[in-house]
Structure formats: C-alpha cells, structure tokens
Amino acid sequence: MPLITPGRRWQPIYYTFHKDKWSHRFLNSIEMLYKGPLWGCRQCGNCLLQETAFICPMECPKGLRNGPCGGSTPEHCYVDETRPCIWFKIYERAFKMGRQELLMEVLPPLDWEMVGGEQLGLLFGQIRKNGTSKVISGLVSTNSEKRSSTWDGVFRPVRQPEWWQGDSEYHAPAYTEPASELERRLKAGEFVVTTEVQPPMTVSTKKLISNIDLVKPYVTAVNFTDGASATPRMSSFACSTVAVQQGAEPVLQIASRDTTRTALQSEVIGANALNIHNVLCLTGDSNALSPSPQGRMDIVDLDSIQMLWVLRRMRDEGRYLDGREIKFPPKYFIGAAASPYASRPEFQAMREHKKVNAGAQFFQTNLVFDPDRLEIWLNELVKRDVLDKVYILIGVSPLKSLKATLYMKEEVPGVFIPDSIVKRMEAADAAGNASEEGVQITLEIIEQIRHKQGVNGIHIMSVGWEEIVPRIVTEAGLLPKDFAINEATHSSEVPSGTRKSL
C-alpha cells in the first residue's frame, strides 16, 4: 500500500515500447525510488498528481484520468470491492484541501510513446526553456500569484502536450443551426422523450425494425446501447444505421471501454456520413461485469470526458487529434451520461460540469427512482451555473418484476431504489400484478420530475420491454406535437384511447 495514495496499485508498472538512453533509464530509476512507495506510481508518462490531490488516478481499475465513473461510491470500487473508489478519495481530499477546482482541467489521454518513461528530464528541460534563474526567483517570490504562475509555467507544458491543450473553460458550440432533430426540439423548448431499443443478439434485423417502427411515432430519438453490461450484441453503429433507413432519429452510443482514439474518430466520421447526428459518449460497464472469458479491464484508451473533448474539437475546429485538417468536418449533437445518485451530489455535479466544459450538450441520466434526491443533484448543478449550457433528459424505467427491481437495487452501479418502491413491488408481486405496478410507479415519477428546474425531457430505458413505451408516453401526456402513427403497423400495440384521439 503506498504511503500517500489510499489504495494499492491495480496493475504493475508500465515499461516503454522502445529502448531508452541510459540517462533516461537512470532518471526513471530515481523516479520509481520515491514515486512507487509514496504513490504507487505506474510510470504512465504523464503525471497528474498535482491536479488530483496527490493521489494517483492510475489506481482506478478503469484507468480513468478525468473523474469517476457513474458507479462511484464512498464505500468501494464496483469493479473490485476489496478496493476503495480511488476517484471518490481524490474528490474527498481535494475538497478538504481546497484544491477541487484543479479537478476541472480536462486532462489528456496517455501518449504511448511516453508511457513507461521518466518525467524528471522533461521538467528539467522545461525549467531550462523558461530560464533557470527566472524559475528560481519566481518560486521564492513573496507574491503568491507569481509563485503559482511560475510553478504552472513549468508543469503545464509537460502535463498538457501541444496535441491536447486541455483547460477548465466552457467551450460553446461553434455553430448555430441545430445538428439534429433532437437538438432542434430541445432548442425550441419542447419537453422531449427519447427511448432505447435493445440491439439484437443475431444478424436478423426483423425484431429490431419492428421495435423501431413501434416507438418511432412516440419519441424524438432512439438510443442503441453499445455492449451494455460488457456483453456483445449488434453494434450501436449498425442499429443506428438501420434506424436512419426506417426514418427514425438515432442516438449513437459509444463506450470508451471498447474504443481507441483511432476507432472513435473513424466511427463518428463514418456515422455522420450516414446521417447519424447524435452521439452519446459513455465510459461503459467494466469487463468485470461481462460473461466469461472476460476481456482486458485495466485501462481504457480514452475516458468519456476525453472522448467529448476530441469530438468537440473535430466538429468545431475541423481537426483530428493528430492535427490533420478535416476538409468537411462532421456535424453532430454531443451527449454524455450523468449519475445523480453516485458518490456525493457535489462530486457528481463537478463531474457533470467538467463534461459540459469538454463538449457535452445534453445529458441522459442514470435511472431515477427518487425525485427528492434528484432535486439535491440539480441544486448542485445550479450552484455550478451549468443548467443553461446543457439539456438534461432524466432516465426512467418501468420495473417489470420484483426480481428486476431487486437486481437493479443491488447490482446496478449508480442506481438508487427507495425501500418504499421495493415494498410496493413486493406487494404487487404477491398480488400478481408487478408489471402494472411498475408502470404506475414510472408514471408517478415522470409527473414528479417533469416540472423540476433544468429538466428538459425524459429518457425511457425499456430494457427489452419496448412495447410499453407507447403506453407510458401516452398516459404521461407526452405525445409529440406532430404525433402520427401507421395504423397497419401499430394497430395491435397502440393503446385504444390513442387511436380514438386520431
């Protein structure tokens, strides 16, 4: 266990992919003599200790470098319950030290040309570049601002390479016309409804098309998950392409768990060329949740905040991460996930604020079953002055059974289900009408949250129960203004009251 980082090293240290000069190897050995015992250093090649309250973020099993995942808890890491959530510890210490705003800087992904190497030489080189005497005089100055500026002048160029240049500022979209129908409706002030259609486990698209056609008239956009629970299904990209062919508005989900920086940039360029204009960036469930044999889980190439940063710059600056110009840049509406119940509300609000600064234009939250606790999280966002910079779609899900309720309560990270709801589902299960009670609970939650500050719509996660979506939207009074259905396609599924109203 390191002396300063409150958690043991997740994996062994990295080694370079090339042979270093003896001088670099010597400095590397010196670094490991003190950084290993003190912080559990893995030699990532881009030390962030000053920005992360002197706790190494590489202790995180997912290798996240910009904040916690949506399953963060005060008690433990959900990937490995024998360890603390290292990002909860970072936030906790940063708030105690008054260094929390340092966490807002969008930090770069690893440069694998630098991974395994030392940083002392880079720092010494930066000191020489800035002027050794100037740096020394600045560091011993009685002016605190000058000391801080001098210190940052040495460390920032090393921390923020030229190809990244992350900061802690908000970057408004560099366009005015909506990139998608979802963005257009949100900008127009409509209360928007989106949903999910479960990707198939086979190559057959018959049921996929049927479900898309079923929900299409009732919602503005349809999401397709990207390997939910780290379990393979048809890709979100393929499902989104089918949705476009069916005349539906897709939301392409991309999980960083399975996505390299090369794949991310290639995928959004291809998706945009195929008229997919909504992209939701997610960390993704850990491979620890996947069926055996499990895939690699010690590191992700990009975290979700880094994905947002890359996609925003591709769209607004017309450049790839490597600096190449994009002659015809993509146009898309960028979204991210939000977790109102993970960790502590003030920690989560900071995480969400950082996502907005990085490029998130809309949030789809994790499932909400407690509107009162949701209010606490929303109030924290108000304090951070971000509600006018992002649209928030609250995640709701109809509980189909008592078994599903208990599974979500006990096994799904970031989801909180009050005991009162569990008791209602237990009573309904005993009476044989659990699914109906689940629908009524969902309708009650929608009614309680729809008028809260900052709430711009709902996202219905049907979890394979797509046929319930028309009823929920109809009974909640959320039919879109241009609502119309194909009678031949929907006659067996649409609530009778809805058909009469047409």
Where is each model-derived feature located?
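Conserved, mostly hydrophobic/aromatic
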Residues: 69, 196, 222, 271, ...
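Short, acidic/polar
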Residues: 202-214, 235-236, 262-268, 343-354, ...
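Iron-sulfur (Fe-S) cluster-binding modules
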Residues: 1-46, 62, 66, 71-174, ...
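Active-site pocket-lining/capping segments in soluble small-molecule metabolic enzymes
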Residues: 171-172, 298-327, 337-342, 384-447, ...
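Active-site mouth loops of central-metabolism enzymes
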Residues: 171-173, 192-206, 229, 250-262, ...
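Active-site-adjacent beta->alpha loops and helix N-cap segments on the catalytic face
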Residues: 204-206, 230-241, 260-266, 286-308, ...
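Catalytic cores of alpha/beta
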Residues: 259-272, 346-356, 379, 401-406, ...
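Conserved N-terminal beta1-alpha1 strand-loop-helix module at the mouth
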Residues: 153-221
